[in-house]
């Protein structure tokens, strides 16, 4: 299990209809297991300042899980506070090299995970926040 992260959650869940009309099938992103990708604000990957940190991807039976680490930048700190207070709880992926059968995604490559106000996949959400402080060990807030 990954130990050095600020929060974690489902980057995408399998077998759920996304708002773009696609459904991600099991193991569609299996080749991304163990890959680290940029963590971005709202899919705005055209500016370096919008990169908030990185996400380590883990392919699971239910989808792709992400362990996310925020940078010590102003945007990273702000995002950490928004997540900590529950103001933002959704994740989303940007993927390419998609192979589809109709609207079902059978393969692709995840290029970034985004912290978003509302995700396309209804199962993509932050489910654990780690509170780092000087007074105690890390504690999970779920």
What does each model-found stretch correspond to?
Residues 24-25, 46, 72-74:
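Short, surface-exposed beta-strand-loop junctions and turns on beta-sheet-rich folds
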Residues 4-9, 15-16, 38, 54-142:
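Residue microenvironments linked to proteolytic maturation
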Residues 21-22, 34, 46, 62, ...:
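Intrinsic-disorder/low-complexity loop/linker signature
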Residues 35-47, 91:
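Short conserved beta-strand and strand-loop elements enriched in small hydrophobics
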Residues 2-34:
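N-terminal "first-domain core" detector
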Residues 18, 49-51:
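Amphipathic alpha-helical interaction segments
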Residues 45, 52-55:
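Polyanion/phosphate-binding surface patch
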